[in-house]
A protein has these predicted regions:
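A structural motif corresponding to the C-terminal end of an alpha-helix
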Residues: 32, 66-70, 134, 138-142
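Structural preference for beta-strand elements that scaffold enzyme active sites
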Residues: 3-7, 36, 69-76, 101-105
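Glycine-rich "substrate-gating" loop/helix at the edge of Rossmann-like oxidoreductase active sites
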Residues: 46-51, 77-83, 120-121
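Active-site beta-loop-alpha junctions enriched in small/polar residues
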Residues: 9-13, 42, 77-79, 107-111
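N-terminal beta1-alpha1-beta2 module of alpha/beta enzyme domains
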Residues: 1-66, 149-150
């Protein structure tokens, strides 16, 4: 079956929609049968000056409070910039407040979100793989016996 979702991010930032307008659009998507809403996880949008960039986990929690059916996910959380324990806690919290509707979208990141903060963009795939290991362990409540290089 074909599913429909909306990505609530780059276009929203560029267009300068207010938080209330974003929430209204998400409520409408929920009521009209959309399957999912994804929110970008960027620190900036350099190609668009004065873009409004909000934390995806906070916005997805706000969206969860005003919707009932749509799944909610990050598009995508950066495994270099965010610590795995923070990612796990944010995803678990969103899943609980949304009553099981959270989707964790996680990737290796990109340089544009790191260079402004002097975070090196080195070995992103290796760091991402380690993040996944840690998050899986945290979900299982057994964060011991990990052999990590980058965290």
């Amino acid at each position: 079956m074909l599913k429909f979702g909306i990505q609530n991010g780059l276009n929203v930032a560029r267009a300068g929609y207010s938080e209330d307008q974003i929430l209204t659009a998400c409520m409408l998507a929920d009521r009209t049968g959309y399957d999912s809403i994804f929110y970008m996880d960027h620190t900036n949008v350099p190609q668009w000056k004065n873009a409004i960039v909000l934390d995806p986990w906070v916005m997805l929690s706000a969206i969860a409070a005003v919707t009932n059916h749509v799944e909610l996910g990050t598009c995508v959380t950066d495994a270099i910039r965010r610590h795995p324990s923070n990612i796990a806690l944010a995803a678990i919290t969103l899943d609980r407040v949304s009553k099981g509707r959270a989707i964790l979208g996680i990737g290796a990141g990109e340089a544009q979100n790191l260079k402004e903060f002097c975070i090196p963009f080195e070995k992103p795939v290796s760091k991402w793989e380690e993040q996944i290991q840690v998050i899986k362990k945290l979900y299982g409540s057994t964060p011991d016996n990990l052999s990590l290089i980058h965290i």
